[in-house]
Amino acid sequence: MPESLANAVAAAAADQAALRSSQLATIFAETGTLASAIPGYRPRAAQEKMSEAVANAIADNDTVIVEAGTGTGKTYAYLVPAMLWGGKVILSTGTKNLQDQLYLRDIPTVRHALNVPISVSLLKGRANYVCHYHLERAQANGRLASKQDAAWLREISRFAKTTTSGDKAELAEVPENAPVWQIVTSTRDNCLGSECPNYKECFVMRARKEAQQADLVVVNHHLFFADVVLRDTGMAELLPAANTVIFDEAHQLPETATLFFGETLSTSQLLELARDTVAEGLSHARDAVDWVALGAPLERAARDLRLAFGRENARLALGQIDADPRIREPFHETLDALDTALSDFVEALESQAERAEELEQCHRRALELAQRLAAWRDDRIAASPVPAAVPPAADAEGDQSSQSSQSVQPAQLGPETVRWVEVFSHTVQLHRTPLSIAPIFSRQRAGQARAWVFTSATLSVKGNFTHYAAQLGLDRDRSLTLPSPFDYAKQVLLYVPRDMPPPQSPQFTEAVVERALPLIEAAGGRTFLLCTTLRAVQKASDMLYDLFAERGINLPLLVQGQASRTELLDRFRELGNAVLVGSQSFWEGVDVRGEALSLVIIDKLPFAPPDDPVLAARMEVLQKKGLSPFAVHQLPHAVITLKQGAGRLIRSETDRGVLAICDTRLVEKPYGRQIWQSLPPFTRTREADTVIRFLEGLGRGEAPQSESSTESE
């Protein structure tokens, strides 16, 4: 390009950028477009700055990473330029809760304020929509586990006749985690597709069609990556047409992408296959074969694989299994038996598949699972470092079909993968996981020019995006850090107790509860106690039950597992003086504003266990490259996770409270400084009396006081 033409192009681009900046200034001004249309709206400089960065990325088909602190108003900051200039936009969130909030509240608000005629669609995974075919089958079958399930089935049947979306979130009468949903929704494996007699009325297909026609489509990360891998979510037609892709809660992307770019085979899938085949066989070809006898060997082999592991929960690298004779022989023997049973099942089903489309679908599923098992067993490339020990119990079984049927072709995974086994109470999952998703994700982003926006409140370590960008193969220089408008020094006291035992000590959780109890009393409840393991949740809650009874402390105690997360949070807000003890699922995506939450206690720094199979393999690769696994991976990951947990406390300018971190490594280890400097600038203390006075004074509107023992950054 001649220099004169290049200069003209650059000048035109600069003029366009200035025009966009002027438009955004008008929209976000104190008396601007948003303020005129949205009651209570207040301008924030960081919000306008982020909006400009997003607008520029859209204009240049560029990538931008934005860490926007809590209270910045990042949702409006990306929605405004997306609606004005984004073209076809895909907006992906970390949770279905945020997905619903955006679709039902935030997007309509901004669309109305801007007065732009854009169409919006909400697209979820197929497990969120009632399936007419499976609903009819469940009603005809009539075999339900309880009267409650039967009542819920009647509610779902009435709902299916009146709803236009089929989205189970709209049916408040049936809990979203009710077991009955599993039999009235479809999976990728058991969907009949265009051969289904109810295809024209299918809620999933209707949602996908609406998404194809919409200007802005709201999805979640699981759906986005499931499509990238499976082309089975309706996104296959969406992504090529998209001009802009925005990831909110983008800190979750590395973990979600790793899940979907790997391969997983679960015994639950095999049991479901056997049961579906028996049901379809009895329905369409009852006299052809003994269907129960056909499915029995596969069911037995799948259960035997679980019985090969004595422990309830474990995450074991294949190398670790092979190094332990107590597990090695039972595992490989039952795996051989499963391989044989699945092969026999495929062969027997082949001759019956032509009798009905439903049986043909079962045959295709069986073939795919057999191929996946063979690929897992024959992988000679994957390294399987032997971790030091078996990690603590997993947080949840989570063996959902939406997460267990993903598969990337082996060539896509690359040479650096790890094979490992995850054992739950009732199922076993065989995983093959890429140690780096950066090259895979980079390939997915290559090709058609479009804008990519990654945003969250927690993406950096002290403003450095190296760790996050490296995980996804992004350019760390195309990033922006925007601080929260909150006055953290006045709103929050950060407390690290003295004289705590080491985090690995058997007495550690007991010490945490002992230090926490006087703070809980001073706060009048209103507490989150966040633990890094489920084992700690159980021990801490048991101790608190006993101590509350012993000392006559009349505070409601809510514990993870008693009910769904949504139910527990609703009860916590309603009670106003509760203590909630939870693990990983409460570290993020939880918003409790006001006086209901004044104290967040974190038991220890959230370092991933070094005996985790995937982490162990990643650490080995880093060591071979001459890098420090701790500095490059473990520490940045812990910082970002801790920032998420700490972010539960302050959700508005009027919130005030105490963040207690009971891990003295935060102040006693050299790396501790890097961790707390990555947190907002809280006032800090190590004196329990200071904390108790502050908590007792919250009702009097007192701010944290600087003392000789208190530091302010």
Language-model-detected regions and their locations in the chain:
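Signature of the SF2 helicase/ATPase Hel1-core->accessory helical subdomain module
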Residues: 84, 100, 188-190, 195-339, ...
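A substrate-engagement module of RecA-like helicase motors
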Residues: 2-37, 87-215, 222-225, 277-282, ...
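A contiguous, basic/glycine-rich beta-loop/short-helix subdomain that forms a polymer-engagement track
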Residues: 182-217, 228-235, 344-390, 394-398, ...
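Walker A/P-loop NTP-binding motif
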Residues: 55-56, 75-88, 105-109
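Conserved helicase motor "Helicase C" RecA-like lobe of SF1/SF2 P-loop NTPases
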Residues: 532-561
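Conserved pre-motif I regulatory segment
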Residues: 14-66
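Conserved RecA-like ASCE P-loop NTPase motor core of nucleic-acid helicases/translocases
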Residues: 89-97, 454-455, 525-532, 536, ...
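Conserved RecA-like P-loop NTPase helicase motor core
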Residues: 485, 497-507, 560-667
